[in-house]
Amino acid sequence: HNDARRQRQMCIRDRDRSATPPIRVFESGAMLIYLAEKFDAFYPKDAALRAECLSWLMWQMGSAPYLGGGFGHFYAYAPEKFEYPIDRFAMEVKRQLDVLDKHLSNNNYLCGNEYTIADIATYPWYGACVLHNIYSAAEFLDVESYTHVIRWAKEIEARPAVERGRRVNRPWGPEETRVLERHSASDFDN
């Protein structure tokens, strides 16, 4: 294992438990599952809904980082613009938005009416894609056509905890609307 890579990776070291040594959890999907189980929140108790939740969580883990990052790199950041990778990644991003849009046309959230860790994991990239014109690509991706994804993302973005979370470590905007580091709930007014 590469120790330098591990030093940059997000992880949880849970010392609140009686386990010795402390429990270590890394990778965002594993961290979400661990926290959901530990705090009994955002994780369906029903076996069928839990399977649906895990399926969507793994769908996001396996797709958004690669496709979103690939699209962003070739569309916005690559030193040279090549049509093939831009079109290939854009096609896949649009295919995923279409999958989400069709699913959300019959569901409030990814697991029906229940907000879960699948939504928590999926919202940041796909929500930013349809609501915040990331990479200045909204028109290119035709994000306005994904009306159910837009509705879902707006509902999630309006959640008080999401509003607070969007302030943490945000490098732009008036200083009074930002929280540069998150240490405790007292960092926030509400």
Where are these regions (language model features)?
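Conserved C-terminal alpha-helical bundle
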Residues: 36-37, 47-107, 128-135
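Single conserved hydrophobic/aromatic residue that forms the stacking wall/gate
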Residues: 1-8, 12
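GST superfamily/GST-like fold recognition
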Residues: 67-72, 110-139, 144-151, 155-156, ...
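A short, hydrophobic beta-strand/beta-hairpin element that forms part of a small beta-sheet core
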Residues: 13-19
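Residue-level signal for nonpolar/aromatic packing positions in well-ordered secondary structure
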Residues: 31, 100, 119, 156-162
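Acidic/histidine-enriched, glycine/proline-rich intrinsically disordered or flexible terminal extensions
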Residues: 169-190
